[in-house]
Amino acid sequence: EAGLRTDNLNNPFPEEANRRLISQISSLHFAPTNESKANLINSGVTGLIEVTGNTVIDSLFMNLEKAQTPDYSGITLTSEKLIFVSVHRRENWGNNLEDIIFGLNLILKEFKDTKIILPMHLNPIVRNPLLRSFKNNKNVILTEPLDYLDLIGTIKNCKLLLTDSGGLQEEAPALGKPVLVLRK
């Protein structure tokens, strides 16, 4: 993420602050784009700056063949209308998370044959409302956080992603999957 900037220390938090701080103490920077390299140069960063492309996507394709198709309670992922939902960001806590839950319930009501896979963040601020809302819904598969290969396997087999994750916003389109970003 060298050189990626939103120019708002609070958004995303804490990622933007972390990127800026790390760029000041690092001597080697792997920028994904020329624009990112220019951001580093314009902010007075010293050290070697290499434009390398997106290492997240490199890792995705390096691991694609090893990706597992997780067994979600006997559900065959490729035969379902499957939506992968991932939500965890601070900006979505509280009322925003309740709005997301409301929207997911609308989808489930309208499209009764749709399944949702929802890995739950460990933070109880996110986890508890999801459990309360979906623990008894047979069309929602609540899981613990996925390891990387299971994550890739789930992305490969879903029809759509709904997420506030910056990483998933990059990975899913690289696999030809549509993404609805759950952020302001």
Residue ranges and their predicted role:
Residues F30, E50, I117, I141-T143, ...:
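Hydrophobic/aromatic beta-strand patches that form the interior of the parallel beta-sheet core
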Residues H29, L151-K184:
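A donor-sugar binding/catalytic signature common to diverse glycosyltransferases
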Residues I22-N96:
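A nucleotide-sugar donor-handling region in carbohydrate enzymes
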Residues E1-L4, G53, F84-V87, P119, ...:
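Short beta-strands and strand-loop turn motifs
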Residues N10-I22:
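Active-site loop-to-helix "anion-binding N-cap" substructures in soluble metabolic enzymes
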Residues A2-R5, N34, K184:
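Short, ordered loop/turn segments at secondary-structure junctions
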Residues A67-N157:
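Donor-nucleotide binding loops and adjacent catalytic segments primarily
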Residues E1-F13:
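A short, histidine- and acid-enriched strand-loop-helix "catalytic/donor-clamping" loop
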